[in-house]
Regions:
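Extracellular Ig-like/FN3 beta-sandwich strand-entry sites
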Residues: 238-240
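Short, basic/aromatic recognition patches
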Residues: 1-20, 167-198
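Generic marker of residues within folded, mature protein domains
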Residues: 11, 26, 68-70, 128-130, ...
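Charged, gly/pro-rich active-site loop segments
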Residues: 1-3, 72-182, 227-230, 242-318
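Surface-exposed connector loops and short turns at secondary-structure junctions
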Residues: 54-58, 231-236
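Short Gly/charged-rich anion-binding patches and loops
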Residues: 8, 52, 230
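Short beta-strand segments
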Residues: 16-49, 55, 63-69, 74-79, ...
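Compositionally biased accessory segments in Actinobacterial proteins
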Residues: 177, 186-190, 199-201, 206, ...
Length: 318
């Protein structure tokens, strides 16, 4: 890594197993976990040539990510550059960046060797899009970074936000089926109704990904975090959001499962609400965040994308 990446961030990138990467689509942020590596001061990932991320990056190169280590979390924003052997438009920069790409490829293979072993075990199940001919290599250049401990901001580098403008009246959605009702039962049961997740928010500066606690309550999906953490994104009162929750596997892609709830958010600072405070307090407690310092994002789901291994689907909550 170069000196442009703070040493504490570099250590988290070396220790973390997955990077939760967000891109911006015309309908809001898209967020999924990806295996990755760090090299030459950048984060490197691969994705299918026809994936949502690859298509969105052609329109908008702004990107954000989140990496967790055992005790700390690193969040970053930046821009993406892709390298595709089948796209002649990337050949010139691929040649120019040859030594860096070779270094990145070495680190990527070394860091994720256990997943390549998993692919070998499941070789007869792996779709073409998940094999090298169907992939593009992506370079994420970090422009802003932050470290969070126990969900709270410990350090930040770059021009992050510092305020949360929440609604005055928070409305919880107690009626209707769970937003995860359309997710296959095995995945839904594995995820449960609350836990640790990642939230991508669409902002005027591009996507921002933050660590959150999440909960399902009645017909609503919610993300909760200390207000100072959400302030990094300086969100509007009603941003487009994507909440991603998953059950990772340490070596086998076929065993990974998760869901992404995409839709419109409603931001509220629990202690500042003029009405709906009791419901917001209860939901923050359900998610596992101290209400006195909690910011809550209620999500009106437009779509829920789920995956298990290489199988995925989309449901549209009522």
């Amino acid at each position: 890594m170069s000196e442009a990446v703070p040493e504490p961030v570099r250590r988290i990138l070396e220790e973390g197993e997955f990077c939760h990467v967000a891109s911006l689509t015309p309908t809001g942020p898209h967020l999924t976990p990806m295996v990755f590596a760090s090299a030459a001061g950048r984060v490197w990932v691969t994705t299918s040539r026809d994936s949502v991320k690859a298509r969105s990056w052609r329109r908008d190169p702004r990107v954000a990510g989140l990496v967790r280590s055992a005790r700390r979390t690193a969040a970053f924003t930046g821009t993406v550059t892709t390298y595709d052997l089948l796209d002649t438009g990337t050949w010139t920069r691929s040649l120019a960046q040859g030594p860096v790409l070779a270094l990145a490829g070495f680190h990527f293979t070394q860091k994720n060797a256990r997943f390549f072993a998993g692919y070998a075990v499941d070789a007869h199940h792996v779709p073409l899009a998940w094999t090298p001919p169907g992939r593009v290599f992506a370079e994420l250049r970090l422009e802003r970074t932050a470290i969070l401990e126990s969900g709270r901001v410990a350090s930040a580098w770059g021009d992050w936000g510092d305020t949360v403008e929440g609604v005055e009246r928070f409305r919880a959605n107690r009626a209707g089926p769970s937003p995860l009702a359309g997710v296959p039962e095995r995945i839904r049961d594995g995820l449960g109704r609350s836990g640790e997740g990642a939230l991508a928010l669409g902002t005027g500066e591009g996507p921002v990904v933050l660590p959150v606690r999440w909960a399902i309550d009645g017909g609503g999906a919610y993300a909760a975090a200390p207000s100072g953490t959400l302030a990094l994104a300086a969100p509007s009162r009603a941003p487009n959001v994507a909440l991603e929750v998953d059950l990772p596997s340490s070596w086998r892609a076929r065993a990974m499962m998760g869901a992404m709830v995409r839709g419109h958010g409603q931001v509220g600072v629990v202690a500042e609400l003029a009405s709906g405070g009791a419901s917001a307090t209860r939901i923050a407690q359900l998610a596992g965040v101290e209400p006195s310092d909690a910011a809550l994002v209620g999500i009106r789901p437009a779509t829920v994308v789920w995956w298990r291994g290489w199988t995925s689907g989309t449901s549209r909550p009522r």
